[in-house]
Design a protein with these regions (language model features):
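Alpha-helical coiled-coil heptad-repeat register
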Residues: 130-133, 137-140, 144-147, 168, ...
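Switch II of P-loop NTPase G domains
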Residues: 2-6, 31-35, 58-74, 240, ...
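Canonical P-loop GTPase G-domain recognition
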Residues: 106-120, 126-128, 134-155, 315-320, ...
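N-terminal accessory targeting/assembly segments
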Residues: 1-116
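Conserved C-terminal guanine-recognition region of P-loop GTPase G domains, centered on the G4
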Residues: 34-40, 75, 91-96, 100-101, ...
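Conserved G1/Walker A P-loop phosphate-binding module
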Residues: 154-268
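Conserved nucleotide-binding/hydrolysis micro-motifs of P-loop NTPases
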Residues: 21-25, 56-58, 90-93, 112-115, ...
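NTP-binding/hydrolysis catalytic cores, primarily Walker-type P-loop NTPases
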Residues: 365-410
Length: 410
């Protein structure tokens, strides 16, 4: 008698979203942050049933929402047997504890969701250390009275959280672990800085791809570097920075780096933890800002990235804009006062357009030069083709020399 094996699909936890549109918090677009919260929740395998929002002058210090709204939420949670309540903001210890006590379900905030996704996406040792550092930094002030609200951060989904044993550590042990991680990351930073300094000494032009999460940075990195990088339609698909040398304009080499994507209300703990990753963009000569032009809130996303770039003291670095996903865009062509191009990573012909944009930006950032090179000096000719943007090579028969014109770094 043959045995049949039945696989049971794990039931998703049911969840509701709760957001407060505070008058004191006008930096972010509230509706788009709630839409993002739904995407973040679904990425964390939560089955979102409903959302509750409230306009207030400011967040309630005790309940996050007003007491009347809390009663409304409680009634819905009990009637529909909801498992998780997700807040659109980072909750204080008191807010989390009070909500947990009143609703008697898991309470998760936006920061925890993003930390969970980062833990899921981290592949390299550096990425995993950075995520753990951010998790512990989030946990440290919440050690007392965390109740059920931190159960997911403690490995509730798989084993990606710091683990229940770490949740039981006292502050001293957590600080010790954080210092250990920082020390390990310092080694990575020093290694990366040596490479970056070497590139700078060799006058290599450096480009960093930046943008909102899921804007298409990895797709363009793949196209320009001729590399099959991870480019699925996922939030925060790229955590570990990738740096490659690419060639444009018949020999001229430049360095291009892919970086972590940004999002509204990106937790400060993550920005701090991923400082070493973001340092790669800080050393760039050009920021190539990829924007999902098909997204209805692409202007908000564009502004969010620029705000974070400013916070990271990178606002002085020249930018060029790739308005991406032209194939999905409807409506007017997006515009900006910065150099820009409107393309689709799905269209191979657009790759040359992006390279041409790069060439124009390289020219504007470099200094013109003219140099005579003896025809016998093949090494010098090769060096100039590799490390400068050559625009003209003219052979002089009278003295058997080449006159080279182009652009180079100071």
């Amino acid at each position: 008698m043959s045995q049949q094996t039945h696989t049971t699909k794990k039931k998703l936890e049911s969840a509701i979203l709760v957001g407060v549109q505070a008058q004191t918090d006008e930096v972010f677009d509230f509706e788009s942050t709630m839409e993002e919260l739904a995407s973040l929740s679904e990425t964390c395998q939560l089955n979102v049933q409903a959302e509750f929002t409230q306009n207030r002058q400011h967040f309630d210090n005790k309940y996050y929402v007003g007491k009347g709204k809390l009663e409304e939420i409680k009634a819905y949670v009990e009637m529909n047997e909801i498992d998780v309540v997700v807040a659109n903001d980072e909750l204080t210890t008191a807010q989390s504890k009070t909500l947990n006590g009143n609703l008697n379900v898991k309470i998760i905030d936006r920061t925890q969701l993003i930390l969970e996704i980062f833990a899921l996406r981290a592949r390299s040792k550096e990425g995993k250390l950075q995520v753990e550092l951010a998790q512990l930094d989030y946990l440290l002030p919440r050690l007392q009275g965390h109740g059920r609200s931190l159960s997911r951060l403690g490995g509730g989904i798989g084993t990606r959280g710091p683990g229940e044993t770490k949740l039981e550590m006292d502050r001293r042990h957590i600080r010790t672990r954080m210092n250990e991680i920082k020390h390990q990351l310092e080694t990575v930073v020093e290694h990366r800085e040596r490479y970056r300094n070497k590139r700078e000494q060799n006058n290599v032009f450096q480009v960093a791809l930046i943008g909102y999460t899921n804007a298409g940075k990895s797709s363009w990195f793949n196209a320009l570097a001729n590399e099959a990088t991870y480019e699925k339609n996922l939030l925060f698909a790229t955590l570990d920075p990738k740096t490659r040398q690419i060639q444009i304009n018949d020999g001229f080499n430049l360095i291009i780096s892919d970086t972590v994507g940004f999002i509204q209300k990106l937790p400060t703990t993550l920005i701090a933890a991923f400082k070493s990753t973001l340092e790669e963009a800080k050393g760039a000569d050009l920021l190539l800002h990829v924007v999902d032009a098909s997204h209805p809130e692409y202007r908000v996303q564009y502004d969010t990235v620029n705000q974070i770039i400013g916070d990271l003291d990178m606002g002085h670095i020249p930018q060029a804009i790739i308005f991406n996903k032209k194939d999905l865009h409807e409506g007017a062509v997006p515009t900006t006062n910065l150099p820009s191009i409107f393309v689709s990573s799905k269209n191979e012909a657009d790759e040359e357009k992006v390279k041409q944009l790069l060439i124009e930006q390289v020219k504007s950032a470099l200094t013109t030069y003219e140099e005579k090179v003896p025809s016998a000096d093949a090494d010098r000719l090769y060096f100039l083709k590799q490390h400068t943007l050559v625009t003209e090579i003219k052979f002089n028969e009278t003295d058997a020399t080449y006159t080279i014109k182009g652009f180079k770094k100071e």
